[in-house]
Design a protein with these regions (language model features):
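Short, surface-exposed helix-loop/turn micro-motifs enriched in polar/charged residues
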Residues: 41, 60-67, 80-84, 99-103
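Hydrophobic, proline/glycine-rich low-complexity stretches
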Residues: 3-15, 19-26
């Protein structure tokens, strides 16, 4: 939190002079990402993404767009919904409409792109999407912890249903290169492939 809050305000205050409104927006981010049902898609996930993006900031054209996309991409997150990305995108648009920020459509596209992580032509979007999947290329033990937290988020589903859904996700990820940028590909692709294949073997 001590890193996320100043980053949020530094970004927001470039486009908004109303401190009360900024407080309202920040409080919403905190409230949503701190929901007790979130075991992985929480503030730690945001911090992890920002840590990864810090290494590639020099290659990012609109850093504010990427930062806002990070803060808002999982704002709405319900495991029973298939519209989380669209709803998060709409929530972002609603909040940012009262500011002077101009790249609204770009950020909305970034948020919606996290649904399938399809290849995108926009360079900033690629770095953003790759940072969202950086966890897949973490060490075996960190990856196992990630899968444990994801399972906890989906604990309302019985094992056979969760397994079916998770297999679908893993196969989709393994069906194409996981990362879109040279930086993240060289850093994480091989390990991510290993992690995903290993998890796949435990589920089939």
């Amino acid at each position: 939190l001590e890193k996320l809050k100043p980053l949020f305000y530094q970004t927001f205050e470039k486009y908004c002079n109303d401190r009360n409104y900024m407080n309202l927006c920040w409080d919403e981010v905190i409230k949503n990402y701190s929901n007790k049902k979130r075991f992985y898609h929480n503030l730690n996930h945001l911090q992890h993404m920002f840590n990864e993006l810090q290494e590639v900031e020099d290659f990012i054209e609109s850093i504010d767009s990427v930062r806002l996309a990070v803060f808002y991409h999982d704002l709405i997150y319900k495991v029973t919904s298939t519209e989380n990305e669209e709803q998060s995108s709409e929530a972002f648009e609603k909040r940012i409409s009262k500011t002077r920020f101009e790249h609204v459509d770009l950020v909305k596209e970034m948020i919606i792109a996290t649904k399938f992580h399809d290849k995108t032509l926009n360079s900033d979007s690629r770095y953003f999407l790759d940072s969202d999947l950086a966890v897949l290329g973490s060490s075996s033990s960190q990856y196992d912890e990630y899968t444990r937290l994801i399972r906890k988020e989906y604990q309302i589903y019985p094992t056979f249903l969760y397994r079916r859904g998770r297999l679908k996700v893993l196969r989709a990820l393994l069906n194409k290169p996981i990362y879109q940028t040279d930086y993240f590909t060289s850093k994480y692709e091989k390990q991510a492939q290993r992690n995903l294949k290993r998890e796949l073997q435990t589920l089939v």
